[in-house]
């Protein structure tokens, strides 16, 4: 975040940004910052060839969390979330990213920043697939066989009894 962006946001959201202006200047100016939907936009708008986040690129428009939720499928209630990292989790006005194993990455506000939280600790009501992300089904790694030198040698079988 630079001075120009902060000034734009102060005009755009005076009641939300203005009360935190000093904190933002002291802690976030000169660094990367994101609100909840900004985490998703930052990933979707990222240009790997330049290393930049290019506004409204890669097919994703500049939308808010509720618009994204209301305009996509598949989605479901939070109790049906599949174990797919990268899904979004949502409740009205807020969105986070499910990273698997019951964990979420979310932007929790100006003073807290971006944090990892437990899925069960949030007020999440639904999950969605983000249409600008390609989900790849993971295949489990095959188990490696036990090395031969660690196997116990088998006892030799007793000889067959000899008949007279």
Per-segment meaning from a language model:
Residues 85-87:
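Loop/turn positions that initiate beta-strands
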Residues 49-83, 92-159:
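Aromatic- and glycine-rich peptidoglycan recognition patches
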Residues 1-52, 92-94, 105-107:
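N-terminal capping segments
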Residues 161-164:
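Long, low-complexity repeat tracts used as extracellular stalks/passenger repeats
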